[in-house]
Design a protein with these regions (language model features):
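P-loop NTPase Walker
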Residues: 2-134, 259, 344-347, 744-747
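Conserved helicase NTPase motor core
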Residues: 14-61, 80, 116, 211-319, ...
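Helicase P-loop NTPase motor core
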Residues: 54-61, 65, 326-328, 334-427, ...
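Conserved short internal alpha-helix adjacent to the catalytic or cofactor-binding core
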Residues: 65, 423-424, 434-475
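Conserved beta-strand -> loop -> alpha-helix junction used to position metal-binding or nucleic-acid-contacting
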Residues: 108-128, 426-454
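ATP-hydrolysis module of ASCE/P-loop NTPase motor domains
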Residues: 111, 132-221, 274, 329, ...
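Conserved helicase C-terminal RecA-like lobe
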Residues: 452-748, 752-754
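Long, charged, helix-prone linker segments
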Residues: 760-779
Length: 779
């Protein structure tokens, strides 16, 4: 074994505390009591480092690795560090090299080599390549490489969302099934035993969206086609890296081979342990040697577990002591990132979570930080808000680097409108998500494409949105008109003429839709003629302004039924639809020429879609979702668009009454009490949470709410009640994850946190320690 030397002495001869003192001196750091306790780990038992946001998780891992090397517990290349992102992996490598270099300056010389820092995906892929069957495989980063072929498998298009959106929801569901270990074939839940109807019921339960059976039938066809395309082209995706590796591990010789490769690692550390999923744990716990597993180190923060929608499972960090017997737990309670005046605001919020590991939350930056609260009586987007004026002022301040400012949002719709508004001020946001660009939004596209269809006399735009005028049946009607005329129309006017002929010879209920379109189209075309014929500029401008209003009105009137249906079925938020419509109407009101509007919109979209072009702009801004922001930090943070879409004041009560992991007997006792004293509010809460199973109880005469114990002695009624219990527990867990999301957002801020509250704000915002309103003194 190579030695770590200090001058002409072997450092192994020194005590751990002496080595820690040397490292403090060489790295110019002062370690806290909590850090010193962790660094004194003797590598004989499993260890959980429960590290709060901003506590220096990467730093403590690298220091632990260096001490293990210095004490002779392991060579550098016998240490394995696993994380979830490529960025974190690079950060580990850079931090290790930096510390080794700085320590060499004081004569503390480490042997050559370094630990293996890797992501789960990279590690699994490297092992899979040892299998001859997969050596020629290529990595497929996204299903979108085959998007056209996959879209063709959708035989039951939705009246509500596009095929592209259907595919996104199908693959989100597939990720969840795989990461939770619910499927071994990568398509159907194993517990369905190949029975499609059973599988559909199970998938409907796992999906966060509401779909009919036809969606799940198409899901099966899409995923089977996807598997075929990957096989034909020798591709494996990130999920395959787990599924195929686990499958090959069922063969003893492969499992033993993989274990021999992994046996070189005497020390293993898993970072961001709160993000691990069932499959990753199953694989890594089988690959590591029993000796290494016996002192496995995991670092994470249960308060930052925010990826359950893709299958991450916080139960591993929450139950680590049960997972690995004799496990120790040490906390890192000090946040070195966020100023105390900001951190103190979020502590009451995160402590309201019922399921969390207890730890103190302390700020290293005492009496620092600025928490700015903006209050408004108006819901929705407002370009005239004080917070946005403050944001623009900071962006334009030459003393502030734009890279130090970030806007964090919960929903894409919030990101869209603000990013577009900023682009109008020539401030361009790095949105990191094409679907969050307003011009790509479905509500925006529906309205503007119908406006283009009527103004430019373009059939293709009308055809794109025909199903939003009269749903799928009207779209089918337009295709029949095309077929009967034997014409792929270029102009909307040609379609309307052909529709007149078709409707005259057939008894079709869709004649009324065609006539409505024709009335609006003819009105707009008359305006167009008048504008082109007048020589009076003022009159032309006045006509043009009126025409723009009528054009917008025509597009919205034609699609009213569609949007009403979407909102009623909870496929779209009424507030979001209204916000986009209102924003679009206000923006159109600033134009005298509709062609200028269409041109400017394309120009904005071009810049917002192209990072190269964004880089050439004078002002840019980081625009991230709360999920994307995890692991990052900024001097100035704006939390924007925290609406009550996911949790409202009614549904929040379910978490208070029925916290996650509540035992069934306690749940029954609580249900009786709540039902008796708060029945109306309980009903509103269940409706707001979209928990519809409660109707099975209220509509069932066999249920006696007064004598519930007797009712639950019946098998059928108990099963119904237990299903409701599970649905409420799932929703209560969602509420706690939403708290964690808000906690993550607040703790991204170093110096200043800006937050806006409005009538439609998420009620969790009010769990922050918000500044009290100053009382007016009577004169």
């Amino acid at each position: 074994m190579s030695k770590v030397v200090l001058g002409d002495k072997h450092i192994q001869e020194l005590s751990t505390n002496k080595i820690i003192d040397l490292m403090e001196s060489g790295l110019n750091m002062k370690f806290s009591a909590e850090q010193i306790a962790i660094l004194n780990n003797d590598f004989t038992k499993p260890l959980l480092v429960n590290a709060c946001a901003g506590s220096g998780k990467t730093t403590i891992f690298i220091l632990m690795a260096l001490i293990a090397i210095a004490k002779g517990n392991a060579e550098p290349n016998e240490i394995l560090g696993i994380t979830f992102s490529h960025k974190s992996k690079l950060d580990m490598g850079e931090r290790y090299a930096k510390f080794v270099s700085e320590l060499s300056d004081i004569g503390l010389n480490f042997s050559n080599g370094k630990p293996k820092f890797t992501t789960f995906h990279a590690l699994f892929y490297q092992l899979l390549l040892q299998n001859p069957e997969y050596r020629s495989s290529k990595v497929l980063s996204s299903y979108r490489f085959f998007v056209r072929d996959l879209a063709d498998q959708i035989k039951h298009p939705s009246n509500i969302i596009t095929k592209d959106e259907m595919l996104a929801e199908m693959f989100d569901l597939n990720d969840y099934l795989i990461n939770q270990g619910l499927t071994s074939d990568g398509v159907l839940p194993d517990s369905a035993d190949g029975n499609l109807s059973t599988a559909i019921k199970l998938m409907a339960k796992y999906s966060r969206q509401s779909h009919g059976d036809e969606f799940y039938s198409d899901y099966v066809d899409v995923l089977n086609k996807y598997q075929d395309l990957k096989r034909q082209n020798s591709y494996i995706d990130f999920n395959d890296m787990k599924l195929l590796l686990l499958e090959s591990m069922q063969t003893p010789e492969y499992l033993q081979y993989y274990q021999r490769i992994m046996s070189r690692f005497k020390i293993a550390v898993i970072d961001e342990f709160q993000d691990i999923d069932n499959l990753q744990w199953e694989i890594i716990s089988k690959l590591l040697s029993p000796e290494t597993l016996a002192h496995l180190i995991v670092i994470g923060d249960d308060d930052q577990s925010i990826y359950s929608f893709r299958g991450s499972n916080p139960k591993y960090i929450l139950n680590y002591k049960r997972l690995l017997p004799n496990a120790q737990k040490h906390n890192l309670s000090t946040n070195y990132r966020t100023g105390e005046k900001i951190l103190q605001k979020v502590i009451p919020l995160i402590k309201k979570n019922h399921v969390r590991l207890e730890k103190n939350l302390l700020a290293a930056k005492k009496d620092k930080g600025k928490f700015i609260l903006y209050s408004t009586k108006k819901s929705g987007f407002s370009g005239d808000s004080k917070m946005l004026r403050h944001l623009v002022k900071q962006i334009n301040d030459p003393k502030i680097n734009n890279n130090d400012i970030a806007i964090l949002v919960r929903y894409n719709s919030s990101r869209m409108l603000l990013a577009d508004w900023l682009a109008n001020q020539e401030i361009y946001a790095d949105i990191n998500n094409a679907s969050a660009i307003l011009q790509n939004n479905i509500v925006y596209r529906i309205i503007t494409e119908l406006m283009k269809a009527m103004w430019q006399d373009k059939y293709k735009y009308f055809s794109n949105q025909a199903n939003r005028i009269g749903f799928r049946s009207y779209k089918n009607h337009t295709e029949k008109v095309e077929s009967s005329a034997d014409d792929k129309f270029n102009k909307l006017s040609k379609y309307l003429k052909a529709a007149d002929d078709y409707n005259a010879s057939t008894n079709t209920p869709y004649k009324r839709h065609d006539e409505r379109v024709k009335v609006y189209f003819n009105s707009i075309q008359r305006f167009k003629t008048k504008i082109s014929e007048t020589d009076d500029e003022q009159k032309a401008a006045k006509l043009s302004k009126t025409m723009i209003k009528d054009l917008y009105k025509a597009a919205t009137k034609l699609t009213d039924r569609y949007f009403d249906y979407m909102e009623e079925k909870n496929f779209m938020s009424k507030n979001e639809v209204n916000d986009i419509k209102k924003y679009l109407e206000e923006e159109l009101g600033q134009y005298k020429n509709i062609d200028d509007f269409f041109f400017d919109e394309e120009h904005k979209k071009e810049i917002l879609s192209d990072r190269m072009k964004q880089g050439k702009q004078e002002h840019r801004i980081q625009f991230l979702s709360l999920h994307q922001a995890k692991g990052l930090e900024f001097k100035y943070v704006y939390l924007y668009g925290l609406t009550d879409k996911e949790v409202d004041r009614h549904s929040l009560a379910l978490n208070m009454w029925f916290p996650p992991e509540m035992a069934m007997d306690k749940y029954i006792k609580k249900w009786k009490l709540v039902y008796k004293e708060h029945y109306k509010f309980l009903e509103e809460a269940l409706k707001a949470a979209h928990i519809n199973d409660y109707r099975d109880i209220t509509n069932n005469n066999a249920f006696n709410p007064i004598n519930l114990d007797k009712t639950l002695n019946k098998d059928k009624e108990f099963k119904i009640f237990h299903n409701l219990y599970q649905e409420i527990e799932n929703f209560s867990a969602i509420v706690e994850e939403e708290r964690r999301l808000l906690y993550v957002g607040v703790t991204r801020a170093q110096q200043e946190l800006n937050i806006r509250i409005a009538p439609d704000s998420n009620p969790l915002v009010f769990e922050l320690n918000l500044p009290k309103k100053k009382k007016q003194t009577k004169k």
